[in-house]
Amino acid sequence: MAMTIGDIEKRVRAVLMDDVPPDYRWSEAFILGAIEDGVAFLHSIRPETRYVDGILTDGVKVPQGAKDEEFPVHSRYREAMVAYVAYKCLERDSADTQNLNLAETYLNKAKTLMQV
């Protein structure tokens, strides 16, 4: 079964314990934007991931309401994307020193998983 953008969002929310609607800490728009950033970051580390079904893509735009769309990156990078989006969320909360340290941990995890 194909992974969707909504699957990534759901997993990120579970990791960050932000999965009780409607009181989300991070908005859907922010998380979808972070997914776009994560794909661009993955492409910078692993340029070959820009090929989707043998076709070179120029990046991913995640429009609002696109949660049912198929995630355009190989499933082996799912946890890397989750870690990167968690990093972006916690980085936004960087006034809290603990969150800043945790954000760095997630960024390092994302980088490691992207290089596998």
Give residue spans per PLM region.
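Elongated alpha-helical scaffolds
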Residues: 75-84, 88
